[in-house]
Amino acid sequence: MRKRTFLGASLALGLGGFSGLVAPSTQAKPAGSKSFHGRGEILWDTYGVPHVYGKDEAAVFYGFGYAQAQNHGNIVVHLYGEARGRAAEYWGPQFADSDRWMLSNDVPARALAWYRASTPQFRQNLDAFAAGINAYDAANPGKIDPKVAVVLPVSGVDVMAHAHRLMNFIYVAPMERTMGAPVPGAGNNGSNAWAVAPSKSQSGHTMLLANPHLPWPTSYFTYFEADLNGPGIKMYGATQVGLPVLRFCFNDHMGFTNTVNSMLGATNYELKLSGDGYLFDGKVLPFKTRTTSFKIRQPDGALKTETLTIRESVHGPAFTRADGKTLALRVAGLDRPDGLKQYWDMGMSKNFAEFETILKRLQVPTFNIVYADKAGHIQYMDNGVLPKHPKGDLAYWRGDVPGDTSATLWTDVHSYDELPKVIDPATGWIQNTNDPPWVATYPQVIHAENFPPYVAPPGPESLRSQQSAHLLADPSKISFDDFVARKLSTHTLMADRVLPDLIAAAQGDPDPEVQAAVNLLKAWNRETVADSKAALLFETWANRFSPGNFTSLANYKVKWLPSDPIGTPKGVADPAKALDMLKAAIGEMKTKYGAIDRPFGEVSRFAIDKVDLPGNGGFGNTGIFRTITWGPLKDGKRIPVHGETWVSLVEFSTPIKAKGLMSYGNASQPGSPHRSDQLKHLSDKTLRTLWTTRAQVEQHIEGRTPF
């Protein structure tokens, strides 16, 4: 069966000139482990979830680092090597572009500066996390792939460098966007988040859903579930591998989650070159230049040294693309070293006053943040470090901005008070599925016209976001069981909007195959589940009706309307054309699947290693809340490439109730039993009880690791 693959972090883009500061030639001292003897233990439950118990804060970080190395060591250590800007030295020329990007954007050097700028306690925490990784390798020689282990030992600076790279130069300013290549996963990445207030809850308790969607191949996007405990420390949730803090987190008092937002924290400035310089406000300015070097391992194992010329304009580091354009990159938030500490403090908070005070630091450079607490408060925030601009909308600032004038050079960013947010709405609920902030609840309480046009586009609202709102907007109060059931919904909203018109258009067609298709679609309950015999047919037709990953509105009778943001688009503009699309879809179904009524789960499989189960869920842009992005057909089957990853649903009762799932399992190391052991839940549309207390954990122990 399929194995989980590694999503390459470097693309061959033919990078030209580079700019930035030279990386330090030495790494920080590797983190040791002797001082942690007798300071804690890890209880491993039967799903491979580490429950870390430390005698102090640093010991908790140490245990968390050890646990990540045990379950995901190959990925974590590889990512740290990439963040050093030395991946080509370790693994060859396919990583040279990545190294150039790291060095040109000063990631290794800035990581060292950020590490030094951290509080003494948080530096200890970073060192402890790294020490845990090193300790796992020392205690288990050979478990981490020797080709990857060349990076070891790691240090607290490596931890900071990876976080800096991930946040600022993958999420905020990915290499591909500057260099003119498609950003990997840009059309699919997403998440779901809900918060329900006591007024909307049947029990009178607040509820929170965390449900990120990211690629399934192992990479910096892979999630890891953990339970962290110590004096004054109690937090449960998930994070991306290599990070020492939880990004999706709850405790007994509150919880928060993230979704990717459209906030644009980086600008590409197109430079007009003149001689050896560039034009700026009518003058020719020289580039600041310097050189550094890095090593590239050759196929025979020899190391070749490459000299890197680094150029910098008034905007930032300059790059020459394959199309001949020279662009300078300006990234907001590079003066904010405490993003990791902010996440840690968010997880340590006990109430909304504490949480909001922490949010106001604006150290986390991007992401929507959705919050809920036991006292009944809920919040949505379009969070990030957002540059202030005098004009222009999001599309303008996402493009190549003229760099020959100071009129476009931003120098300030928006404050917390200036960013869109919804706090304790009268509706009693909040949602976000990566769409603009304006329908965080409905009826709307914030509006695009009250914010600069570069904050977020006014619309359209995606069908997944509309379905999310519909799942919460009915007048009934929601029990926890109903909360779970709504989250597991596989209903296809797009079918509600267009199937009546399509069926009407096809009803009188004399072709018996068309009538067979009509009968399938009429009988379909519009659920994308394993035994559905019409879901694949509808998906195949919908891909023609709404091309561009199901985003085109051209064939709808009624386009998306700001006045009806969760009721449009709808209808079929040209019934005859839609019928032709159905006939083409019938032919495609017969060619690809052998019949027009293949059960969805025969073709769509949840398969990792030797586990191969019927799938459910589908493309978010068809209005399915349970998002699974299916990969290309291979040997008559397809598997997820993106979608449902970490899920947690929490009711802040006494004690709290928590359900969850890590779709692809909580480990990626070869031979781990936890690489695929949760796929059965995913296939059955069920969730696990999350064991949040020591008493619960003790009943489900698979192993103990004292330290």
What do these predicted ranges mean?
Residues L21-P30:
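Signal peptide processing junction and immediate N-terminal pro/mature segment
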Residues K29-P510, A523-F707:
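C-terminal/peripheral segments of proteins
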Residues G14-L15, Q363:
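Residue-level detector of secondary-structure transition/capping positions
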Residues M1-G14:
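N-terminal secretory signal peptides and thylakoid transit peptides that target proteins
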